[in-house]
């Protein structure tokens, strides 16, 4: 057996066989339940930077596809864009959390996301036995975009107008994992920088996905020291009113429920800094993050 590339990944080998077996068996009903379903995964944050976490994520995605789950991966890459711009002597500017994007910057974004970040992800998945294909929003009209309402100040920042679901579905039916860089275009040929969270949400809605999973740098929704396993719309409204959910988490929560209202089955927020968090969230009863559900009932709250 080849040595695993990370000490963290080797810890599982130290556990008694009797402890590992039940964890594997616990996954069985979820594998049956989700076979043939579509999961859209937004990949970003620390999980894209650390070599061990990148390996873990690629393994997780490959395993999900191998057990029959259709995976559509949408990635970010903000730090990589900033570093590339710096090397080229271009200063990055941000307004309300959005990257100000002129023609020079959109070229950097295309070069970095499509030419480097996207292909690195595809290669890593392939190394673990998966079949991934790199896609940008420009390919086969995958993402048609409109200018952002604040285009006068943000420049070539866009919002999703339309998703080519037929093309994505074609790739999934061929057994491939589409790895999508969030770049879009309009009828005039303008290319737009699109927020990866927004792109993932739009793709999940268009595909009527079973799940939209955000792999991020937060463990989930915190209430005090506790991470909520499940949250419904009513609870979220109460927590926002009480100030328990505040700051930058408010738009994320509201966006999650808007996506749910548009037909996506469940939304999950998980910590990409935790090894194998994706598998643990999907294939165990407890999960490791927070799942957003449309209605609170015993069946939904106890199942991933």
UniProtKB/Swiss-Prot annotation:
Residues holding substrate: 77-78, 99, 193
Record keyword Nucleotide-binding present: yes
Role: Catalyzes the ATP-dependent phosphorylation of N-acetyl-L-glutamate.
The name this protein goes by in its record: Acetylglutamate kinase
Residues annotated as site: Transition state stabilizer: 42, 252
UniProt subcellular location: Cytoplasm
EC number: 2.7.2.8
Keywords for the protein's UniProt record, in alphabetical order: Amino-acid biosynthesis, Arginine biosynthesis, ATP-binding, Cytoplasm, Kinase, Nucleotide-binding, Transferase
GO cellular component terms, A-Z: cytoplasm
Record pathway: Amino-acid biosynthesis; L-arginine biosynthesis; N(2)-acetyl-L-ornithine from L-glutamate: step 2/4
Upper taxonomic lineage: Bacteria, Pseudomonadati, Chlorobiota, Chlorobiia, Chlorobiales
Alphabetical list of Pfam families matching this protein: AA_kinase
Molecular functions (GO terms): acetylglutamate kinase activity; ATP binding
Recorded catalytic activity of this chain's protein: N-acetyl-L-glutamate + ATP = N-acetyl-L-glutamyl 5-phosphate + ADP
One Gene Ontology term from the biological process aspect of the record: L-arginine biosynthetic process
Gene encoding the protein: argB
Top-level lineage group: Bacteria
Top EC group: transferase
Similarity comment: family membership: Belongs to the acetylglutamate kinase family. ArgB subfamily.
């Amino acid at each position: 057996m080849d040595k695993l590339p990370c000490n963290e990944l080797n810890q599982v080998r130290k556990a008694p066989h009797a402890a590992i077996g039940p964890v594997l068996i616990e996954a069985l009903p979820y594998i049956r339940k989700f076979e043939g379903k579509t999961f859209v995964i937004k990949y970003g944050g620390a999980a894209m930077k650390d070599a061990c976490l990148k390996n873990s994520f690629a393994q997780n995605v490959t395993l999900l596809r191998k057990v029959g789950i259709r995976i559509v991966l949408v990635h970010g890459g903000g730090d990589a864009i900033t570093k590339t711009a710096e090397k080229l002597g271009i200063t990055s500017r941000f307004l309300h959390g959005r990257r100000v994007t002129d023609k020079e910057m959109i070229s950097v974004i295309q070069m970095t996301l499509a030419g480097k970040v996207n292909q690195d992800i595809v290669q890593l998945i392939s190394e673990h036995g998966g079949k991934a294909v790199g896609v940008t929003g420009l390919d086969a009209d995958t993402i048609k975009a409109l200018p952002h309402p604040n285009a006068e100040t943000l420049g070539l920042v866009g919002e999703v107008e339309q998703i080519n679901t037929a093309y994505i579905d074609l790739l999934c039916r061929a057994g491939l994992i589409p790895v999508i860089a969030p770049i879009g275009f309009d009828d005039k040929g303008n290319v737009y920088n699109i927020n990866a969270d927004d792109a993932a949400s739009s793709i999940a809605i268009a595909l009527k996905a079973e799940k939209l999973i955000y792999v991020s740098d937060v463990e989930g929704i915190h209430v005090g020291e506790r991470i909520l396993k499940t949250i419904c719309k009513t609870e979220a409204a109460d927590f926002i009113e009480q100030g328990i959910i505040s700051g930058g988490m408010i738009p994320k929560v509201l966006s999650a429920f808007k996506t749910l209202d548009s037909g996506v089955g469940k939304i999950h927020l998980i910590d990409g800094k935790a090894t194998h968090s994706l598998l643990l969230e999907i294939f165990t009863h407890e999960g490791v993050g927070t799942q957003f559900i449309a209605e609170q009932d015993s069946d939904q709250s106890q199942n991933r």
